[in-house]
Regions:
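Glycine/Thr-rich phosphate-binding loops of Rossmann-like dinucleotide-binding domains
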Residues: 81, 250-252, 317
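Cofactor-binding active-site loop characterized by glycine-rich and histidine/acidic residues
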Residues: 33-172, 190-196, 201, 206-208
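A general secondary-structure junction signal
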Residues: 75, 244-246, 326
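Conserved acidic/glycine
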Residues: 1-57, 254-328
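Glycine-rich ThDP/TPP pyrophosphate-binding loop and its adjacent helix/strand module
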Residues: 117-122, 126-313
């Protein structure tokens, strides 16, 4: 399958930006926190779930999407939001609970919403699947070529909404794609303790749809598989399931003691960092120069730093605004 060099450059910049962003959020979250109880003062209220190491899933899919395409994400949403083009300044302000945030500081990091690029996420496991299904149904009824993508973790593939939504999508041949990021653990439970099948893409056969498996967190394979799935969806060939074998380098949440996995496991997998692998591919196979790579990295770092500064300098909402936008 032909691969666009411009697409790969976009993927690299996006993946690098995601990594920089998650590193910055990890620092911000740790600020002022007790090392024992993980509570205390700091710019980030609430919990924080970071996607360091899972960058290929979001970048490899979203490179093929348009602004009009819908993306829903789970409680670990930063990489999807960045790849879909959510405003980084307002996203960071929302995470910091500021009035300039996407939800005026009331949603936090698990409830980002940007209708301008058709992106949403939520803290309920699997809830984004039927939301994306509805967007896919609307896209078909309107006669568009838009697609809807639901990103989930492997644990959510055992939710009833997963099966119900895929059954409906298959029956109506909707432009619907479910991307399963199998990062090996549902909180602390290994996939082998929760699911009998070796990978969730094989479940596609039960719905009569296409299933894909991306091994080893491979950015190039994710690009190719996503391209085919999106093209099938746009041309009326129905839904697909993609499972990517990925890995989160950090805990389930910031402050996770990670007693359920061996530190050597993380060390070994960090040696196969997908960002470094894509960087080497661009240099060795695509004729991209070190100078071009450096420019992309500097641009990404600058955008992250700018978003961080914007959020830190923004004001908190006023107490009298607490009940605004609340519907009962």
């Amino acid at each position: 399958m032909a691969i666009s060099k411009d697409h790969l450059l976009w993927m690299y910049e996006t993946m690098y930006k995601i990594r920089c962003y998650e590193d910055k959020m990890a620092e911000a979250y740790a600020e002022g926190k007790s090392p024992v109880f993980n509570i205390g003062a700091g710019p980030v209220p609430g919990e924080m779930h970071l996607a360091t190491g899972q960058e290929p899933a979001a970048a490899g899919m979203c490179v093929h999407l348009k602004k009009e395409d819908t993306v829903t994400a789970p409680h670990r949403p930063h990489h999807h939001a960045i790849a879909k083009g959510v405003d980084l300044n307002r996203m960071t302000a929302e995470i910091f609970g500021k009035a300039t945030g996407l939800g005026k500081g009331k949603g936090g990091h698990m409830h980002l919403f940007d209708p301008d690029v058709k992106f949403s996420c939520g803290g309920i496991v699997g809830a984004g699947i039927p939301h994306a299904l509805g967007a896919a149904l609307a896209a078909k009824k309107k006669g568009t070529d838009w697609v809807a993508v639901a990103f989930i973790g492997e644990g959510a593939a055992n939710q009833g909404a997963f099966h119900e939504s895929l059954n409906m999508a298959a029956l109506w041949k909707l432009p619907f794609i479910v991307v399963i990021e199998n990062n090996q653990y549902g909180i602390s439970v290994p996939k082998t303790a929760s699911t009998a099948v070796p990978s969730n893409d094989v479940r596609a056969a039960a719905y009569g749809i296409k299933g894909y498996y991306v091994k080893d967190n491979d950015p190039i394979d994710m690009y190719n598989v996503s391209k085919e799935a999106v093209e099938r969806a746009r041309t009326g060939q129905g839904p697909s399931i993609i499972e990517i074998e990925t890995y989160r380098y950090l805990g389930h949440f910031q402050g996770d003691p990670e007693v359920y996995r061996d530190k050597n496991e993380v060390t070994l997998l960090r040696q196969k960092d997908p960002i470094i692998r894509l960087r080497n591919y661009l240099l060795n196979e695509c004729g991209v120069t070190e100078e071009t790579i450096a420019q992309l990295e500097n641009k990404a770092t600058s955008e992250v730093d700018q978003a961080y500064a914007f959020a830190r300098e923004s004001d908190y909402p006023k107490p009298e605004e607490a009940l605004e936008d609340v519907f009962v």
